[in-house]
Structures are given as structure tokens and as C-alpha cells.
Amino acid sequence: MRLVLISLDAVFSRDADFLLSLPNLGALAGRGVFCDRVQTIYPTLTYPVHTSLVTGCYPNRHGIGHNELFMPAIKPGRRLWYWDASHIRSDTLFTRAKMAGRTSAAILWPVTGHSGAIRYNLPEVLALPGENQLIKALRFGSAWWMIKNELLFGSKRKGKQQPQLDEYAALVAAKLIKREYAPGERFGPEGDINPSRRDEQRHMPDILALHLVDCDDARHRYGTDSIEARQAMIRLDLRVGQIMAALLGRKAMDETVLAVVSDHGQADVLGTLPLDSWLLANAVPARAQTLGLGAYLHIKRGDYLPVLKALKDNMAKLHIKHIYTREELRFMQAPEDILLAVEPEEGIMIVDDEQEEVPAATHGFGVDHPGAQCLMWLSGPMFPADTRLESCKIVDIAPTLAYAVGLSLPGAQGRVLEEIIKNPAPEDAQKADLA
């Protein structure tokens, strides 16, 4: 049993009715299970959430607590991100698949750089000032395979601009799925008269993860409810349709789990708060690291109480809605080294640098925000058709997918959604457990 996992970045519960009205995502909901109340993690940032999507763990276990490394001395736009798979401290679907002898592919999936578990790897990495985007991606990914794709589809891409980048990514994914069986290359000029099903599909990866960013880009640039965001969602539906068509054309739909998920929503930005500058100006022994619509406070343990008092005394002045204490952060299973965090009033974005560019919308809010309710479609022979799941957690997705395709994630903090699985694939579960 194969797995195709597609992430629709920055779509959320409020988008459900519109997305279900579109031809491909609507049809996919009819083929299997749909849920519009998938509780995401804290923080609501792309890299931590996408790591949870493939580990079933919270940041306190998988180790990815932010998109960027904490580098306060370096200006925004020049900081390193968590691009490398070695940053992840727990097993992923990719590592467990490799233990079970399966192949994986990842296309623009966060935190996959230099992964030894992914055979076909086009990682999401961003060129910093002075770097070349293509050369950097080749260094972090499967270079020769990426070069072949660039020769085939490079004309479709305009750097990292959307929607062309998503179009390129979907073409690469569909090409992987549609790779033709070529018996003459393996068995001689007369070919293999009766190839096995596995031989027929030997080039299609067992796990394929695809990250589509069009809607996230549109919302950051134009706003949460912009026409451009609505148009991006229509394009996302077309991309999902491309993948479904490739699976149907390969006659692999009935032997594949197709999962479409999201990571977080967004909310419009109405103003900014330079919290780190305020801390420095007022000699508060802490440094802020923006999450967007929230921030971490990096402090020494001995400074916890004075920093907490300084924040409480200035909540109204700073337009802070909520201060997350260390107890609340431990309950949310946020990174263990974060002892304090804040969430400002609705629409206030915390900035690390007063000169940085401010988007029209962003995320990074707490788990009680409406944008923290995400979406999930699950289709495959083990999932009942036309079924609504009332709610689940985003950390439940990876162990459920692993179980459905005969793998396991014994370190996952989420649970297997057994109530929506009829017959899981047993083939490699025991082998993976023993690996």
C-alpha cells in the first residue's frame, strides 16, 4: 500500500465549504473521510507543523519549534531556517519507510534537506542574500534527479514565485507517479510477458509527500479573504486533481492512501509591535523571537519571574492579549527551552526589526484561534466513503497514515484514528516495529 500526502499550506476550517464545492476536493471527500476540525500544534508555523505531520509528535519531542533558528544578532531575511532533516529528533514516515525497505519522495516538504531516508528529494530551502536558489537546493536535495526535473519542467518555474512553483511541484509529483514500467530495460528485448503488480509500479515511490504553498503566499501578500487567496484555492484544487488523475491513469488509486491535509490558517495584520526593541529599551532580561501573531521570550531560568512581571505590568501598553506561562507551554508541548510566550491583540504582528516588511496576513497565533483548526481528507481502501470525522489532532495524522499503509510510528504522541480505518495494510508493520 502506497501513500501520497499533500499539504495545502494556510487553508483552514473556514475554507471548508468553498473547498468542498470544488470538483476534486469535493470528490475526494466523497471517496473517503473528511474532517474540518483538525487541531494544529503550537506554534502555528509551517516547519513545526509539517514536522508534526510526518512524526505524529509535538515540538517538545520532534525538536522543530520555529521556522528559523534563534539568531537575534542577525537581521530578518538573513537568518538560517530549519532546512536540514538532521534537526528532527524523532522518527518520520520517511525514516520508518526506509527501515521497512520502502522508497520515499518529498517535494518542497519542510525540514527534509540532506535526508538519507528520501530517495527523490526536492527540499524546501530558501536562498539567503548572496546565495543562488538552484545551487542551494541541489546541495540539500537529490541533485541528479532535480537536474532531470529542471530540464523537463524548468520552463514552468519562475524562481520561487507562485503559482508557478506549485505548478512545477505538481508536475514533478505526477511524473513520479506516472513513471512507466519498462520491462525491456530489465528483462531483455522480449520483455516480461506477465510482470507482477509490484514490478509494474516499481518506479512509483511508496511514500510521496508534496507541499503546496500557493494559498499561503497569496494570503501573506493580499490578505486572508482576498480574491487572490480564493483564486489560489481553486488552483490548489486543480493540483490535487492532477495527482488524482496521475494515480487513476496509473491504475494505482485503489492501492494508494491519498491524504490531503493543511497546517494552519491566517489572519490579517492590522498593526505591529516591536517587542524585542521594547525589551532592550527597558532593560528587561529577555529577547523576543517573533512567531508572527505571537512571540517566544528567550530567557534564563532565573529571570522567569521578573520577565513575567514586566510583561504583566505592561500588557495594556504592549497590546498583549495573553502571556503563556511555562506551565501552559508545557501543557501545549511547546519546545522545552521556551519558558514564556505572548500573543498580542487580534491583528497585531510582533516584529523583530521595525524596518522589516509587514505582510497583509500571517499566522503564529495560539491554538484557540480559529485559524488553528485545520482540514484533512483521507482516501484509500481502508477508509469508509463519504464519512465525516468530527474532530482530531494534527499529531494523529502520521500514526494513522503509518498504520493504514502497514508501517508504524512507535514514538508518536498522537493516536491512530482506528474508528475510521476498516482494514489496515499489515505487510510491513511488524518489520518496521522490529527495525
Predicted regions and their residues:
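Metal-dependent active-site segment of extracytoplasmic phospho-/sulfohydrolases and closely related
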Residues: 4-5, 24, 235-275, 401
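Active-site metal-binding loops of divalent metal-dependent hydrolases
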Residues: 9-10, 262-265, 346
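Short, structured active-site-proximal loop/turn typified by the sulfatase FGly-forming signature C/S-X-P-X-R
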Residues: 16-61, 105
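Anion (oxyanion) recognition and catalysis
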Residues: 29, 98-99, 252
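His/Asp/Glu-rich, glycine-adjacent segments
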Residues: 57-223, 316, 351
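Active-site-proximal segments of metal-dependent phosphoesterases and phosphodiesterases across multiple
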Residues: 222-237
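Active-site neighborhoods of enzymes that stabilize oxyanions during catalysis
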Residues: 288-400, 428
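Long, internal low-complexity/basic segments
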Residues: 391, 402, 414-435
